[in-house]
């Protein structure tokens, strides 16, 4: 790893640099309590591996190239990760590399095969394995550059890792002016269901709850609008108007995802697993009786 000062650059400026350098990159950042930036923002680019799944077909491309037909796609991911485990090094940021991407709702079908899951155009999952990470330390106003390397050929791979660190530092220090972000006209949205249809869905859901069939459900609508430019301009607005514990900007070959979420569904850190879903959560009691 390598440290450089970050007092003259922001995570968004870094993201813009990555956008000019790579077709596959990400930014992960967080605001705690809706008012204070978390210590780290994480960025990465040029993943060494991409793993996608659709209808039980897992495709790996990059460091490994193969296709696997399976009804347990997560087992393929576990197998891949077993070959890319990094040691825990005291003092480094909590994320030093790994898979970044998304799991679609259709993944539920592998755990509950009896459910009739409607699959859309999205893959069941789309994950990229990043061995290079830029960790922006808001507290110390430093950037930690991290490169992971394989140990099968230490001298050769160490040389490549050092070269990658130099390239990352040069990318961050590049002062070439970037073109301004374009802002298009106000978008026109269309919805996949009408207001009347959605009202009926909500009423039917309430009936299920009153009858005791279910205790909660999340109903949603999909709004769509054509948009020709990068979502980065919209993400800049999103992160300032709706700062949240989990904010993401992800770009894969021109397809972009941005999101802002308050919910910790599952978190694993230092061997401790935490879940705190917003929907249905209630305070724990101090005793079993209070629970």
Which stretches of residues belong to each language-model region?
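Extended alpha-helical targeting/anchoring segments
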Residues: 1-291
């Amino acid at each position: 790893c390598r440290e450089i000062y970050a007092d003259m650059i922001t995570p968004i400026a870094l993201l813009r640099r990555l956008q000019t350098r790579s077709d596959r990159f990400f930014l992960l950042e967080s605001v705690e309590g809706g008012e204070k930036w978390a210590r780290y923002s994480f960025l990465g680019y040029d993943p060494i591996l991409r793993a996608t799944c659709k209808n039980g077909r897992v495709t790996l491309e990059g460091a490994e190239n193969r296709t696997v037909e399976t009804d347990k796609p997560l087992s393929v991911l576990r197998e891949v990760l077993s070959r890319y485990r990094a040691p825990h090094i005291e003092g480094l940021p909590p994320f030093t590399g790994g898979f970044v991407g998304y799991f679609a709702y259709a993944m539920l079908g592998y755990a509950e095969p009896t459910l009739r899951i409607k699959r859309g155009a999205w893959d069941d999952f789309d994950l990229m394995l990043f061995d290079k990470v830029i960790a922006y330390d808001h507290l110390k106003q430093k950037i930690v550059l991290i490169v992971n390397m394989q140990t099968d050929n230490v001298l050769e791979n160490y040389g490549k890792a050092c070269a990658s660190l130099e390239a990352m530092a040069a990318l961050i220090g590049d002062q070439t002016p970037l073109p301004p972000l374009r802002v298009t006209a106000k978008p026109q949205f269309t919805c996949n269901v009408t207001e009347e249809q959605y009202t009926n869905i909500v009423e039917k859901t309430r009936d299920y709850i009153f009858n005791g069939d279910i205790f909660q459900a999340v109903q949603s609508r999909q709004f769509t609008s054509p948009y020709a430019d990068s979502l980065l301009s919209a993400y800049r607005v999103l992160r300032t108007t709706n700062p949240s514990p989990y904010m993401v900007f992800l770009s894969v070959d021109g397809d972009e995802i941005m999101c802002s979420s308050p919910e910790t569904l599952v978190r694993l850190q230092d061997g401790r697993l935490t879940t705190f879903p917003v929907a249905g959560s209630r305070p724990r009691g101090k005793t079993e009786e209070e629970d």
